[in-house]
Regions:
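N-terminal secretory signal peptides that target proteins for export/translocation
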Residues: 1-3
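N-terminal pre-domain segments of enzymes
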Residues: 29-81
Length: 648
């Protein structure tokens, strides 16, 4: 079942009666080719000042493993067919080429396809074109951009400040590069759990620093994210809805409790004495405006944060009330399920925990990530909620759940290979189901669920419509700031800190950034992929209004509608930019001579399909009534439809 297509009355009702659009300088935009009165488009800005670029090397999927992936996809379909028969479910028809190409671009690349990509795919008669397109999308930059947004929501990635005066950019960059190089998921997670050092020296340490000073909460978050299990209630008392006891929670937390995240200013590493106080005293001599901290805290405090083993031992709380322990009793590390973790002499218990959690023998590690990614593609997990597995949790299809878990292990936690398998199933390639599944409802996956795009997918789709090369812009690499912020407090001086601070604030760096961003800027908005914008964006930004999370809690992004979203779509700068003369949409439309061809470009660009006869007639009527302005009205109408905003 497809989303209802735009009716004649809906198109006319949505169409504006004003001009095609007006630039901020008041120049009317005209679509007529060859019109001698058309003003030349404004000159492009000068190229930006050269600044360091982050090298992007995207690891492609291997063509040699495609046959096995297709065989696994067929196995998935066989298990689903048996489930359909068991529950007397009729699967949805196969999605049209137009529906499939739009869906797979959104799911894997995080954006709608261009109209040329739609046309090429639909016109292609190759029987393997779907499998080849899946491989292509998994091998391009859009994949890492898309799944960076996914992990940013789960890992609560923040560019600006990870924790007290510690920037998150190196950690965010490490996550992105892990996706680009297709680092196996078990290695990705192990790298975060076992990391040591400052975020500048070992960016993966950002995971532990994210919950600095909260070791018990950190354990709860880790088990929830990577093992799909919520044990947080047992932090204060025996879990009321699961089998975990408070003591078991503390035994798990004992693995990582001896991990420090901040050195004391008087740490022996700094040679004795309070190094921060000493530097602050010296700063008063160097900078007469020094007020004790402020902008200098990113040097003085930020460089105290370092993941290290401090040997601290965890004890039960002072008010512990159960018979299996005593208040303030020392707790030894012990796993709550699966095989025990082997703590070797002389090795941090945290390393044993990291090995145990990421082991293929861990009963919930592979199951959790396979279930999470299934939900990413189908709109619902085989087990719901995906982060609250219990011993008695019943998968919708136990045999399929077990097979997908085993496949994750077989492909050695290669997430691209796993996604390749699922996307090649007949089940994924069926029409979407327009059903609202609430907790407790049975859903047997006759097709993927119809769902609204994420905030990042909406934003990136607008960028694809407006910008010629949406993946071209890369965020400034972390090393630009690293060479200035990363200092050894034991060896530095107030003068060095002062000079580094001056350089960070210098007009040269500011001008370089402004020049770099200028070609991608429009009315205060940076027109680049969401993954290349600061994360998260401020509350008033388009992304936040469409549900991007504030990165304060795990997975709190939203696809719910709101009045601010309607206002953004009706009259926001992101909508107006589509009608600017340098917009890719305008260029593509004006490249066609006939109004009929132009209408097809508009529909295929925005909805990835040609207009119906009724829609074509409505569009022609609008253009006839308002001349060239009518084309802009049609564009405006289509981006304001549910069909544009939903993944079907």
């Amino acid at each position: 079942m497809a989303v209802r297509q735009l009716s004649l009355s809906a198109l006319v009702a949505l169409a504006l009666v004003g001009d095609w659009g007006v630039t901020e300088h008041g120049t009317a935009m005209v679509l007529a080719q060859g019109n001698k009165n058309v003003k030349a488009p404004p000159k492009k800005p000068e190229p930006p000042v050269p600044v360091p670029e982050r090298k992007v090397h995207v690891t492609a999927v291997s063509t040699s493993t495609r046959p096995r992936a297709l065989a696994s996809a067929a196995k998935v379909d066989g298990l689903m067919d048996a489930n359909y028969k068991k529950f007397k479910v009729t699967p949805n028809p196969t999605a049209s080429d137009e529906q499939f190409v739009r869906r797979v671009y959104l799911d894997l690349a995080g954006t709608i396809p261009t109209y040329k990509q739609v046309r090429l795919f639909v016109a292609n008669s190759d029987t393997e074109k779907k499998a080849k397109l899946i491989d292509l999308l998994l091998s391009q930059e859009g994949y890492s951009s898309n799944f960076y947004n996914y992990w940013a929501d789960i890992l609560r990635l923040k560019d600006n400040q990870l924790t007290n005066n510690v920037p998150g950019k190196p950690y965010c960059e490490w996550v992105k590069e892990s996706l680009e190089t297709n680092k196996p998921y078990d290695q990705f997670v192990y790298g975060m759990l076992s990391a040591e050092g400052k975020v500048w020296d070992n960016p993966a340490s950002g995971y532990i620093l994210r919950d600095s000073g909260m070791p018990l909460d950190a354990m709860n978050n880790t088990v929830r994210i990577f093992l799909g299990t919520q044990i947080g209630c047992a932090q204060c008392h025996n879990h009321p809805f699961d089998r975990w006891t408070q003591k078991e929670f503390y035994e798990m937390a004992a693995f990582t409790f001896g991990t420090g995240t901040r050195r004391g200013a008087g740490d022996k590493k700094f040679g004795g004495g309070n190094v921060v106080n000493k530097l602050r005293d010296d700063m008063k001599k160097v900078d007469e405006k020094f007020d004790g901290g402020g902008k200098y805290n990113r040097f003085l405090i930020g460089n105290l944060f370092e993941v290290h083993d401090n040997g601290a031992k965890l004890v039960l709380p002072h008010d512990y009330q159960y018979d299996d322990g005593k208040p303030k009793q020392s707790v030894s590390p012990k796993t709550i399920f699966g095989p025990p973790a082997k703590v070797e002499k002389g090795v941090s218990p945290r390393i044993a925990f990291a090995k145990w959690l990421t082991s293929p023998d861990n009963p919930r590690f592979a199951k959790t990530i396979s279930n999470r990614l299934w939900k990413r593609l189908f709109g619902a997990g085989l087990i719901e909620p995906v982060d609250d597995l219990k011993d008695d949790s019943q998968p919708e299809n136990p045999e399929l759940t077990d097979f997908l878990t085993s496949e994750m292990v077989r492909v050695k936690f290669d997430l691209k290979e796993y996604l390749r398998i699922v996307c090649n199933t007949k089940a994924y390639q069926r029409e979407a189901t327009q059903a609202e599944v609430t907790p407790g409802d049975e859903f047997h996956f006759p097709g993927p669920l119809l769902r609204r795009m994420t905030a990042e997918q909406v934003w990136d789709s607008f960028i694809t419509l407006a910008v010629t090369k949406p993946d071209e812009y890369q965020k400034e690499p972390a090393r630009v700031e690293a060479k200035l912020l990363n200092i050894d407090l034991a060896k530095t001086s107030a003068q060095v800190i002062y000079e580094h601070n001056q350089e960070l604030a210098s007009s040269d760096i500011k001008k370089s950034r402004e020049a770099r961003n200028k070609p991608y800027s429009y009315k205060g908005q940076l027109l680049v992929r969401a993954s290349e914008l600061p994360s998260p964006q401020p509350p008033g930004h388009f992304l936040r209004q469409f549900g991007q999370s504030d990165r304060e809690a795990i997975e709190v992004s939203s696809e719910d509608g709101s009045v601010p979203q309607v206002l953004q779509m009706f009259n926001g700068p992101i909508t107006h930019m589509l009608l600017e003369p340098e917009s890719l949409m305008v260029k593509n439309v004006t490249s066609e001579k006939s109004s009929d061809a132009r209408i097809e470009v508009i529909f295929q660009s925005i909805l990835a399909r040609k207009p119906t006869a009724a829609e074509r007639q409505a569009a022609q009527s609008e253009i006839k009534a308002h001349s060239d302005a009518g084309f802009g009205n049609v564009i405006w109408a289509l981006v304001n439809t549910r069909e544009f905003l939903f993944v079907q």
